[in-house]
Amino acid sequence: MEYLSAFNPNGLLRSVSTVSSELSRRVWNSAPPPQRPFRVCDHKRTVRKGLTAASLQELLDKVLETLLLRGVLTLVLEEDGTAVDSEDFFQLLEDDTCLMVLEQGQSWSPKSGMLSYGLGREKPKHSKDIARITFDVYKQNPRDLFGSLNVKATFYGLYSMSCDFQGVGPKRVLRELLRWTSSLLQGLGHMLLGISSTLRHVVEGADRWQWHGQRHLHS
């Protein structure tokens, strides 16, 4: 009876709740993070690969394997060369972020022909970005005649949007060119018919006016 009287149902419920919370936390923490897509290029921007990874180390491992590189690698943002050297910063990157991989001794450089801020002048120290627009031209298929274009706009450093214009192959380009040529020739034909009809009416009108003039003279 003393054992039963010492039994506290509230304490048992608290213990069960604590164990359940601990199990839920462990299950949640053990769940692997989701795979996210990234675009990685070499320091010359001649090789570009699309890779998925859940962590910075996993992405570095895949870059080593895919690009056949060796040694210590460094990942930086392709647009401005910001180093991606911590897991916390990596997790803050958006999907489809363009990254550049650098081997030992290599350094980031801007794209050739890229327009700089203020026509080459340095950006004022106390200025604030309103919008930043980046253009990325790439090929998904070596047979594509024109590369695909990715346009990414960031407003006030908070809101961003991107749009992909997919490239097309030679057959589709030829098809579109023939279609536009056909439409152009058809429109040109209608225009020539209209001009011909107008000239005919002008000539017939002139003949009629000349005939009426001669008739008045004879009368």
UniProtKB/Swiss-Prot annotation:
SUPFAM superfamilies the record matches: CAD & PB1 domains
| Loss of function: phenotype | Mice display lower levels of plasma triglycerides and free fatty acids and show smaller lipid droplets in hepatocytes. Mice are resistant to high-fat diet-induced obesity and are protected against hepatic steatosis. Mice also show decreased very-low-density lipoprotein (VLDL)-triacylglycerol secretion and reduced VLDL size.
Task: Tell me the membrane topology, using the record's own terms.
Answer: Peripheral membrane protein
Is Membrane there in the keyword field? Answer: yes
Q: Does the keyword Endoplasmic reticulum apply?
A: yes
Which key words are in the record?
Answer: Apoptosis, Cytoplasmic vesicle, Endoplasmic reticulum, Golgi apparatus, Lipid droplet, Membrane, Phosphoprotein
* Gene Ontology CC: one annotated term: lipid droplet
Tell me, what is an example of a GO biological process annotation in this record?
apoptotic process
Subcellular location per the Swiss-Prot or TrEMBL entry: Lipid droplet; Endoplasmic reticulum membrane; Golgi apparatus; Cytoplasmic vesicle, COPI-coated vesicle
Location of Phosphothreonine modifications: T18
Q: In which tissues is it expressed?
A: Highly enriched in the liver.
Concerning Gene3D superfamilies, the annotation shows: 3.10.20.10
Segments forming domain CIDE-N: 34-110
> What PROSITE patterns has UniProt attached to this entry?
CIDE_N
Q: Which Pfam families match?
A: CIDE-N
GO molecular-function annotation terms?
identical protein binding; lipid transfer activity; molecular adaptor activity; phosphatidic acid binding
Domain of life, source organism = Eukaryota
The family this protein is said to belong to: Belongs to the CIDE family.
Quaternary structure note = Interacts with DFFA. Interacts with DFFB; inhibited by DFFB. Interacts with APOB. Interacts with PREB/SEC12; facilitating loading of SCAP-SREBP into COPII vesicles.
Please describe what this protein does: Lipid transferase specifically expressed in hepatocytes, which promotes unilocular lipid droplet formation by mediating lipid droplet fusion. Lipid droplet fusion promotes their enlargement, restricting lipolysis and favoring lipid storage. Localizes on the lipid droplet surface, at focal contact sites between lipid droplets, and mediates atypical lipid droplet fusion by promoting directional net neutral lipid transfer from the smaller to larger lipid droplets. The transfer direction may be driven by the internal pressure difference between the contacting lipid droplet pair.
What is the official name of this protein in its record? Lipid transferase CIDEB
